[in-house]
Amino acid sequence: MEKARKQYSLWKDAPLPENLKKEAIAIQGDAEEIYDRFCRDMTFGTSGLRGKMGIGTNRINEIVIKRATMGVADYLLSKHEKPKVVIGYDTRKNSAAYAEETARTLAARGIDSYVFMQPVPVPAVSFGIRHMGADGGIMITASHNPKEYNGYHFPSRQMPGCLRQKNLRFPSLTEQLPLSPVPSG
């Protein structure tokens, strides 16, 4: 419970996007909600991250997307001199914004990205990887999960295996990366 309260305080006092700031204020006196949202950090599963959207380390939001992308960027830069990534998104709430945030974060790390200009199905990203000669792909989708959810999915066969092999876990990322905004590239 103490870890969750500390994380909540850090987030509440950080320069967050307006929507997350409002949520931080809304849950201020709700210990159960704070615990649920901040009790753990999301970890990369077999195909990425999936969860409810909202404020917290245990939710999908702009900060979690940035941090995940920074971890993916670090990995790609360790394997490729000038990596390229294809980014797609579905029609869910926030998917387009999360795709844009992903592209900005990659650009800030010197990674070129190709973002679809409209929502696409997951196979389109796999096609884009091959068509553009990219080193990986990211799809913003929660697949079959309810509308309150979103996700950060790796359609490329290479990326999930690479992440598992390197044991790239989200908790280790959150200890190293700040809550401050990622500069745009």
Predicted regions and their residues:
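Gly/Ser/Thr-enriched, mixed-charge loops and adjacent short helices
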Residues: 11, 15, 33-38, 42, ...
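An N-terminal, well-structured beta->alpha segment
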Residues: 2-102
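Conserved short alpha-helical segments that host acidic/polar catalytic motifs at enzyme active sites
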Residues: 46, 107, 183
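Ferredoxin-reductase
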Residues: 9-11, 81-158
